[in-house]
Amino acid sequence: MEKTFDKSIFYLFIFAFIIILFILNNSAFNDNLPTCNNFVVNVYLYLALSICSIAIFSYLINYVLFGKSRQYYRPLELYEILNSIGSPFYIFSIIMTFVLIILIAFSNGFDNNNVGYNHVIWFLFLFFISVTIYPKFKDITTYNYVDNALLITSIIFIVMTYFYYMFSDLFLNNMSSIGMGLLVSLIVIVIVELINLLFFKRSQYFLSFFKITSYLVIILFSVFVSYDTAEMAIREKECTSLPNYPKFSIDFFMDILNIFSRTLFLKSTK
């Protein structure tokens, strides 16, 4: 049985985190304040920092829960993981994730003097969302597919980013209609999945239907990657001073997270 949370990978993420932090400090900040210089690069650096933070937090959570036991490397059943985390804290983490993402969404994008506050709520968001997705890395039914799901997610992200740059005029000239279409599609999928969960959970078709909607979610958030890339290009032109880079990186992060989660689900339920 393969082991989970190899410590050599943890050290690799620590090293990557430090390198990205060093580059970010030189690229995005001047006199400890964020600048508009290298705007696009800085957003991607914050995205990379977010991903490294999720990995580091997940390793730390695993160490806190199982560091002194043989279960540190072992994949476990989902109920064992949730019992170790504690259901109240897990639910609290889900609630805090939503609260913090709302706070980030309503923070100013530019001319934002609350640099420390912006980074604190962003870092707290990354911690609490790490708690909610940590079980996917430890669960005996999904852990073996994490690398594959990450690879597929990375390919989708790169391809859809390239797709925007190939057809940038298509997106930039139709931002409102594309954005509305994506929003309506997302709302419809959420409603349909809630109906499936509430009324058809015990049906023999529940899992098959959820697989279908998972493919739709992957397609939807793949388009979101291109749309958010277009948004970033617009924000770069609008930037005047003190950009809120944590806020701008969150959209890409959520795109990646949704694509990864659904890809992992589909891989683990073949």
Report the location of each language-model feature:
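A hydrophobic alpha-helical transmembrane-helix feature that marks the membrane cores
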Residues: 1-270
